[in-house]
Amino acid sequence: VTETRKYRSPSREQAKADTREKIVQAVVRVVLDDGLHAFTVQNVALKAGVSHRTVYRHFTTRDELLDGLAESLDRIAAGSTVPTTPETIDDVIVTVAPSFQAMGEVRDAVRAYVITSLALNWQDDNRRKRTLAFDKAIGAAFPQLPSKERREATALIRHLASTRAWYALTVEGGLDDAAAARAADWAVRTLFKDLGRRDRAAAKARS
């Protein structure tokens, strides 16, 4: 008796996801290999080895291509054991160093993301949500701080925990991923310690 083996093709949804990721990786290669000036839907299609129509089915504009890159990085971050959107300052503290190490594992994608977001003055929705989460966590931890000081601290700490800080410390500063992670971790902890001191002083002054 001859056994009939059934060939199971990938599901349609998985095939779509694979194509989408292939296109996203093509964005990375276009930006890093050919330059930001070459970042067009057509060039991404050529780099991915797919038709312009195929790209258009997934992403209709450059901004949507960048959203796709951001979503790809978010999926990687979601697979880690640290919180991606902090609820407390402890979440921020435990996130910084592991996040920097994770960025180093997908450094080309992070480099492309930072280059394009800065050059095009663009940021994705999740980045904005994380910024608001940082502000809420810091405000809850240091309720006596004047709003001006809190905003300044939030902006700096948010930057230190970002892809842009990783880029500045590694690509521009020449640190390896481990050293960059230590530097950012130290800076965030130092700032929180100082904010605690200032918050206590403000509370005492008001009592």
Region annotations inferred by a language model:
Residues 91-94, 98, 102, 118-155, ...:
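Amphipathic alpha-helical packing segments from all-alpha helical-bundle domains
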Residues 31, 59, 64-73, 114, ...:
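Alpha-helical DNA-contacting segments of helix-turn-helix folds
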Residues 1-49, 64:
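Basic, helix-initiating cap at the start of DNA-binding domains
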Residues 29-33, 38-39, 67-95:
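Amphipathic alpha-helical linker/stalk segments
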Residues 68-73, 98-121, 132-136, 167-168:
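Amphipathic alpha-helical segments used for helix-helix packing
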Residues 49-59:
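Short hydrophobic/aromatic patch on the recognition helix
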Residues 154-175, 190-200:
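Amphipathic C-terminal alpha-helical segment
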